[in-house]
Amino acid sequence: SRLISGNFSELEDLEEFFAKKLEAPSALYYNSGYMANIGVLPVITDRSTTIICDELIHASLRDGIRLSKAKHVVFSHNNISKLEELLLKIEGKKLIVIESVYSMDGDSPDIEEVFNLAEKFGAGVMVDEAHGTGLTGENNLGQAQQFINHPNCVAIVYPLGKSAGLSGAFVVGSKMLKQYLINFSRSFIYTTGPSKQLVIQLRKQLETMMKKDTSFIFALKSQFLNSLSSHYQYITGPYGAVVGLITADKTQNIESALMDDNLFVKAILSPTVQRGMERIRICFHDFNTKNEIDSLLSILNSRV
């Protein structure tokens, strides 16, 4: 545990480096995004808190809510009007929990409007940046970073297993939040700290990620969407690299055809997504090529 013998200067330097890049008061490293989410929510809420969350938040956020003693209610996906209705009805302490980019749909909430409502109704906000980190914003650190010092921002979680390509997560927030987590967050306290080798590599990976030109990823995504058959229904958003191609009962057959052509594209089935919304989840990377996109389109368009 970092509280006994697992702490070292390189790890503290990494936390300070990440916080400084975001112009944030502090950052605390967890071993994974899952451990961050289940570790933070029970600490920042209590029995008098009501958590108001988007219906499509991560399983890790849902588990964190279950581990907390807070009450919780759900609003329909990205529906700001429904969120406002709930905020108007609920008394006492309130915490809004959202993601900057949703993992299955690839779309985003109106984060600015969420913070406006939080300010209006005296609610805190927690944002998960798992699928936004590494793609947009200053230093490729997502869309939520501009709200880090907003008075209603409680925490922003930056998992490192996606764009950074390693493991772990930073919880970014006030210095008081960091001290509370160090002393009360069970998934931080009762686990082995990261190795020095991992921390050194993370620093290198983050420095690389922050300098990357990500426009190529969005160019590939545009190439794909512009050439995809109009018979397909898809879900995506402006800030994510994910496109959810709704394929219902054809999903597994399409996945097999793509895998046979060495295209690693996964089928997402019920109950991960609701019945009738089964899909091929396409995630674009900077190592993908235009030829790979052409192959992907050829197979998909031939199966309309």
Predicted regions and their residues:
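Substrate-binding/gating loop at the entrance of the active-site cleft, primarily
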Residues: 32, 52-68
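Structural motif of enzymes handling amino- and sulfur-group chemistry
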Residues: 176, 193-212, 216, 220
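Conserved PLP-binding catalytic core of the aspartate aminotransferase-like
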Residues: 216-225, 229-262, 272, 284-286
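Conserved PLP-anchoring active-site segment centered on the Schiff-base-forming lysine
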Residues: 40-59, 217
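Active-site PLP attachment segment
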Residues: 147-180
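Active-site phosphate-binding strand-loop segment of PLP-dependent enzymes
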Residues: 73, 77-127
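PLP-dependent enzyme catalytic core of the Aspartate aminotransferase-like
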Residues: 10, 16, 20, 272-304
